[in-house]
Amino acid sequence: MNSYLRKLVEGKHLTEEEMYRAGLLLLNENILESEIAAFLVLLKAKGETAEEIYGLVRALREKALPFSNHIQGAMDNCGTGGDGAQTFNISTTSAFVLAGAGVKVAKHGNRAVSSKTGSADLLEELGVNISSTPSEIDYLLEHVGIAFLFAPAMHPALTRIMKIRKELNVPTIFNLIGPLTNPVNLETQFVGIYKRDMLLPVAQVLQKLGRKQALVVNGSGFLDEASLQGENHVVILKDNEIVEMSIDPEKYGFSRVKNEEIRGGNSKENAKITLEVLSGEKSVYRDTVLLNAGLALFANGKTETIEEGIKLAAHSIDSGKALAKLNLLIVASNEKLERVN
């Protein structure tokens, strides 16, 4: 670890292979906590590259719980969090809209870190059992079309690092890589990030991970979701090419809405919002979900255009299919899946 620390002190970038090896050392129980803290702070001060992010992602995925990865066509729409906007659970609500539209959603997530309610907190409030094994997750993806992967359970080697991150109380590379460490072999991905300057590096990492298609968005007001407030900056990965563009919600028929108007609350309050959206109630919450789910359906290749994605998202809700997916996941996740144990 000392050689990597010296490079970082000198402001030099690590190669992908160096970062991979450093990542394995970070997960080694014999390394000193002071070394872990120093590494994370120095890396943050220097600024992370796509190669460094990918190297660490390789190490974390290697040490994650093993999956059979026989499920084809899975997608995740997990964002980084960390924008501090205290919005309702946009991506988790959107996940059921995607599932209702026929996308297999492997939703990677955690409890609240910078918000009041994380995806795990919301799903528990709704009645979903978030404690699923890899074999149970495979079953849910195949038979329900959506499953939740509780990040701490998927990455047990990260327990000590989580403690150190909390003690440091400053953003580190781990604030960026959550969506990139999903242990399921995803084909497509929709990622919201809170740092605009990391749009391209994250897209490059998704390309290295072999995603067929992906879309990375930094919303107006630096939201880690697409926002109705104004211009959204996106990077699209398609046909192994990366294209940068901006998206104005007004172009797609939405009225502009300030981010403050889509704030959430505790798990009970956010569960109420999610159920209202999935039940077809018209609101700014629904419009926000339609924009994000529409972009995700486009990123998945389910539709050829963003406009078609938004229309399909609306149909998923208004037909009752999105809500049906939630109800099915509640039942299936709480069953004793003896057939896969």
Swiss-Prot record:
Listed binding positions for anthranilate 2 are R165
Record: residues binding Mg(2+) 2: D224, E225
Q: Which terms are listed as keywords in the entry? A: Amino-acid biosynthesis, Aromatic amino acid biosynthesis, Glycosyltransferase, Magnesium, Metal-binding, Transferase, Tryptophan biosynthesis
Give, as in the UniProt entry, the pathway in which the protein acts: Amino-acid biosynthesis; L-tryptophan biosynthesis; L-tryptophan from chorismate: step 2/5
Q: Does the keyword Nucleotidyltransferase apply?
A: no
Record-listed Mg(2+) 1 binding positions: S91, E225
This enzyme catalyses: N-(5-phospho-beta-D-ribosyl)anthranilate + diphosphate = 5-phospho-alpha-D-ribose 1-diphosphate + anthranilate
Cross-referenced InterPro entries: Anthranilate_Pribosyl_Tfrase (IPR005940), Glycosyl_Trfase_fam3 (IPR000312), Glycosyl_Trfase_fam3_N_dom (IPR017459), Glycosyl_Trfase_fam3_N_dom_sf (IPR036320), Nuc_phospho_transferase (IPR035902)
Q: Name one Pfam family in it.
A: Glycos_transf_3
The UniProt GO MF terms for this protein read: anthranilate phosphoribosyltransferase activity; magnesium ion binding
**How is the cofactor bound, in the record's words?**
Binds 2 magnesium ions per monomer.
Record-annotated residues binding anthranilate 1?
Answer: G79, N110
Q: What is its EC number?
A: 2.4.2.18
Cofactor names = Mg(2+)
**One of the GO BP terms on file:** L-tryptophan biosynthetic process
Assembly notes: Homodimer.
Q: Which NCBIfam families match?
A: trpD
According to its UniProt entry, the function of this protein is described as: Catalyzes the transfer of the phosphoribosyl group of 5-phosphorylribose-1-pyrophosphate (PRPP) to anthranilate to yield N-(5'-phosphoribosyl)-anthranilate (PRA).
Family in the record: Belongs to the anthranilate phosphoribosyltransferase family.
Q: What HAMAP family would the database entry show? A: TrpD (MF_00211)
What is the designated name of this protein? Anthranilate phosphoribosyltransferase
Which species expresses this protein natively? Bacillus cereus (strain ATCC 14579 / DSM 31 / CCUG 7414 / JCM 2152 / NBRC 15305 / NCIMB 9373 / NCTC 2599 / NRRL B-3711)
